[in-house]
């Protein structure tokens, strides 16, 4: 341990990393391609993640508190403006403390040679995220600061008091003994502040600042330590611990298993959990996401305490829109300021200036509207939850819950009255007329340009209607008023049971051969050769292939992209054995015929049966493409299989995923090197992700139902 690391411990409570990525005992470090991260608890128990992107030299600190804050900078070596630096985490713990309304955390980095540090961004993690999406990390190290265009336009319109808050203040203090770079920035409304300090020993390093860029020259051939201190005066969340989150049965199971994998996932769940919300993921999505919470609630039922659904439902119900729809995502702190400023610029409404940090909600997604009744239905049907708790929940949230149930019934009514494809629940339209992908495949091409999603219309709407009927029954049984117009809901639920017929795609052997060969012919030589060899080894001769399309186009015609979405259908609804076999079959057929990729996992989609225009869509945006495996989809399928006698399918999927070395990631991809397929970490993947951590329930189910 270095002298600097010892000093860090003396200046605050020693805080060892709560999680480290990659962990050589659990991960394949090569698959992380120079990426590393450490996660801590601050003095209030809030999560702090620090990561180093070795490809770009970007170092980001996420503060997962009530403002979703971040502090980031880029480190480059002397090899040129675009050369990432040799920088790494120093050994030893961090230090955490609170003082004068600030929470602080300090740790150490090691640097070699001569490095330049710039591109400082202090503010919302959403702004850091946009900095990355815009590719600005590849700008010269002394490029003008990244400022959201909304802020620039706002400053041009308002007086000068805001201008000085647009960019961070940078000041170097240097003596022969040591040096300290101090960087600070207030929020645009000056209500909150973030601070960053970099400190070095003058005997081992020399520091200068030019045009907002810090240059550190290491004296000698050995690496030198630089301490990094971050601080915030933002509000903290109230964290939950494992005893509050998990059931006693699961905790006993985890304690007896003594599994490093389970312990890491339990810690991950703690890092995401607070009384206010379950955050979607660290580092990029450290805030409320309705879909992520609600889907997690369904998957985690087997392992968490029966109070957790109350936290989840309460968080969603507190944010309902006026019509009863569920908020997909909240905008906090700096991002709330950004969105309120944008609305002010658009409308001129000066009342927005009274509270620029007023939380804003995003209601564009539609799947979460139907997921809330499903979670509520499971909660009220749970006989282990005492009636007095249910009454107490209804006393606080009953009016909001009924508003959501009524909204769902209204959305489902058109199809119940006229069950044709174009009466299904459609995505909302963007300004350009494009059907906004309003479910979990929320990249622009996630649903291949479709308007009616399989998962919304075959899984969530029917499940929501059935849940409303179940909720009505429980409410009446415990002496509460039932759901209004329940007879109409019952009739709608019956009609919606037939919605799957609109999505089914059936292909004969000749069509399968023609389309798969056409897809392979469009690929680069190396990639095509690999998949040709897969098909040759498999030696499959399929008479027919049936699968549900990812979506329907605007005219109600299926877009024949095979996906993992039927896994949720299997999990939530019992099928007869023949239907179950048909649903499961594509998961186990080798890609590019099905979804199974040996040594990687389950491709989240297979576009081989679609048109070249769809292939091009996915080639341009890989997030929900055949090049990606999503941990949530693996968990959904395994959870479904755990309740059925399918040991062969379970073993095949688990083995493929384990061989990737990335089975703990939110999502992962693969690339070709020397003709071989190699799994790799997906660039924007979360290190700790709510959906991925549902593996806890999968492991419990698989190991307790043997």
Language model features by range: what are they?
Residues 2-10, 14-265, 275-294, 298-310, ...:
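Terminal accessory carbohydrate-recognition/targeting modules of carbohydrate-active enzymes
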Residues 286-419, 458, 628-654, 689-704:
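Aromatic-rich carbohydrate-recognition surfaces in CAZymes
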Residues 376-379, 460-476, 566-580, 636-645:
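Extended, well-ordered alpha-helical segments in internal regulatory regions
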